[in-house]
């Protein structure tokens, strides 16, 4: 489908602050703009919407987050020199839990309701994925949404979503604490094709299944089974030649 556009908000200040994604989703919902896909990283939230709504949504988001779109600012590229490797580090996070919601009604406002309730309970959400595939359930288009939270927040998050499910009639709500998030990071991957393919191939070689994928310009993260965490970390280190003793500092 070429009649789509991606709108995104970004900023290091959103790390650990509940409600940023919910505010973006609510801005779209209030304008009756439907979200077709969602993808996030720690510092960025992206939504795919209808191309015809793009300019209007940019204006609304600029008002919601007090960003001046008319200001002329020089943006300096931070791409690393070409002789630097595209991936500078690999990180494994085993303190995550995955919450999945099946068959969320594909109407404006659903994502806003879900993540506003989580924010009201002071639950910070890390990765968010909304499937592109649309399921028709009882003549109602639906999509699946999955997200990760800290393990300490998993039970409360499940309870919040289960209560909401009674109101909006989603499908199954499930939680899984036995996961790990594996990430590769590096500013050199910008404009460097093949990084994701190498990352995924290294996991496939070890027969490790990927449950979720999130990306940004400088980071690719996969959610995998917790029992595969160390094996996956070692495989990705080897694939990108990061097994040496040299210490590399990765900017936040």
Go through each PLM region and give its residues.
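A conserved regulatory-domain signal marking ACT and ACT-like small-molecule sensing domains
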Residues: 1-252
């Amino acid at each position: 489908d070429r009649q789509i556009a991606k709108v995104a908000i970004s900023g290091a200040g959103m790390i650990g602050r509940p409600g940023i994604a919910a505010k973006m989703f609510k801005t779209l919902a209030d304008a009756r703009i439907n979200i077709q896909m969602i993808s996030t990283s720690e510092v960025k939230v992206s939504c795919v919407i209808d191309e015809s709504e793009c300019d209007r949504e940019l204006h609304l988001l600029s008002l919601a987050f007090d960003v001046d779109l008319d200001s002329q600012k020089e943006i300096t590229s931070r791409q690393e020199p070409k002789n630097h490797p595209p991936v500078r580090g690999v990180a494994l996070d085993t303190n995550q839990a995955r919450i999945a919601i099946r068959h969320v009604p594909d109407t404006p406002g659903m994502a806003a309701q879900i993540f506003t309730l989580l924010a009201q309970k002071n639950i910070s959400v890390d990765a968010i994925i909304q499937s592109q595939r649309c399921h028709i359930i009882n003549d109602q288009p639906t999509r699946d949404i999955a997200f990760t939270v800290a393990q300490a927040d998993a039970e409360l998050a499940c309870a919040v979503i289960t209560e909401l499910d009674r109101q909006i009639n989603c499908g199954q709500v499930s939680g899984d604490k036995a996961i790990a998030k594996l990430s590769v990071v590096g500013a050199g991957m910008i404009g460097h094709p093949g990084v994701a393919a190498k990352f995924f191939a290294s996991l496939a070689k070890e027969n490790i299944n990927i449950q979720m994928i999130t990306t940004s310009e400088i980071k690719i993260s996969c959610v995998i089974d917790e029992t595969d965490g160390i094996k996956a970390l070692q495989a990705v280190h080897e694939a990108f030649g990061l097994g040496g003793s040299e210490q590399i500092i990765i900017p936040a």
